[in-house]
Amino acid sequence: SILQGGCASRPGMAFTNIISRETDRTVFNLGFSGNALLDMEIAELMASVKDPGLFILDYVPNSKAERIQEAGEEFFQIIRKAHPDVPIIFVEDSYVPRTQFNTKNHEDIHSRNQEQKALFKRLKKAGEKNIYYVPAEGMLGDDGEATVDSRHFTDIGNVRYVEHIMPVIRKALR
């Protein structure tokens, strides 16, 4: 529901549609209601896309750290095998305001982000080219206005997410 833009006030305010307008490209969003769980079937579906401009891997909010560790590289490799030169962007989960008060939640997000970062570093070290990383820091701001429930993006949350990720998208598309 985060990826599908479930709490945007209208479809055009979901971040995928904003990115589509910003880049003048069609964006396919394969995040369905809590199901960004590194399922290999989704990686195969992504790999089957003809002539993609780039891929954004934003599964961290729904995955567990253990799942990222055990399946993240295989998920990536399925896509990379089909599209060896296409840019792939890895995105961290955002630290929403509730994590200031809920240390368990903060630790959970931190451990998932650390696994994502470790995966990215392993791939870079192994010689992977054309991969990019978007850290969580500064993603949504700290005023509490970016989410409806400390999880799902409001319109302003979608806009802030796009503002945070667009410099990396632009760099990847050069």
Positions of the model-derived regions?
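Serine-esterase "nucleophile elbow" of acetyl-processing enzymes
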Residues: S1-F32, I42-S48
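Alpha-helical cap/lid subdomain in secreted, periplasmic
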Residues: D39-R174
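Short, small-residue-enriched loops and turns at beta-alpha junctions
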Residues: G5-G6, N35-A36, S63
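Acidic/histidine-rich helix-loop elements
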Residues: N29-L37, S150
